[in-house]
């Protein structure tokens, strides 16, 4: 739903940033481990500070670092979810939701990694798209990430750089 809202709405980038930060904020409370809570809170605080710097009235932007912190936070959530998923042998609705959550976190991580690849190299995806190097590109990155996770791809968008191709094979 978010990519559709981002493409149609004039406030899609703001909504994307609010939702991404709220996911990372809610993840702080998804474990009972004190050290995981601390690491998650630190990563969230750094991510929030970097976003405020970028959207504030100053000339500085740490776009790549923001996404690297987002990837680190996503990896932490994957670790937390996998620990919860395999803690016992009981199959329940919570276990199924947890498995879907892991899958969606992999898609989010893939999209964030594509943003880093594009920001660092200037080339990531090709096809019938125009990438601007801004948050608006998330629509294409999450689409490619989800399609690569669920199928072998539709062929309308494809990886063109070596790092993006390696990521596509990982997904």
Give the ranges of each region predicted by the language model:
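Outer-pore turret/helix-boundary of cation channels
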Residues: 7-8, 109-143
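Aromatic-anchored segments of alpha-helical transmembrane domains
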Residues: 2-4, 45-53, 108
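Short, hydrophobic transmembrane alpha-helix segments
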Residues: 2-14, 27-35, 56-57
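Alpha-helical transmembrane segments and their membrane-interface exit regions
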Residues: 19-30, 46-50, 69-79
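Pore domain of cation channels
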Residues: 136-171
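Cytoplasmic-side transmembrane-helix entry/capping segments in multi-pass membrane proteins
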Residues: 35-46, 63-71, 91-102
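Structural signature of hydrophobic alpha-helical transmembrane segments
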Residues: 5-20, 63-75, 138-144
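Pore-domain transmembrane helices of cation channels
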Residues: 77-123
């Amino acid at each position: 739903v978010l990519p559709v809202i981002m493409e149609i709405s004039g406030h899609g980038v703001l909504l994307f940033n609010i939702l991404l930060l709220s996911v990372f904020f809610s993840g702080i409370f998804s474990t009972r481990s004190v050290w995981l809570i601390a690491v998650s809170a630190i990563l969230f605080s750094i991510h929030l500070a970097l976003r405020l710097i970028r959207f504030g009235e100053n000339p500085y932007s740490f776009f790549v670092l923001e996404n690297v912190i987002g990837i680190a936070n996503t990896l932490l959530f994957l670790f937390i979810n996998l620990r919860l998923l395999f803690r016992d042998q009981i199959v329940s609705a919570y276990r199924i939701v947890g498995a879907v959550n892991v899958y969606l976190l992999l898609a989010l991580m893939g999209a964030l990694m594509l943003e880093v690849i594009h920001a660092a190299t200037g080339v990531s995806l090709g096809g019938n798209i125009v990438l601007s190097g801004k948050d608006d590109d998330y629509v294409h990155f999450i689409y490619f990430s989800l399609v690569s996770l669920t199928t072998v791809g539709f062929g309308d968008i494809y990886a063109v750089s070596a790092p993006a191709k390696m990521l596509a094979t990982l997904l």
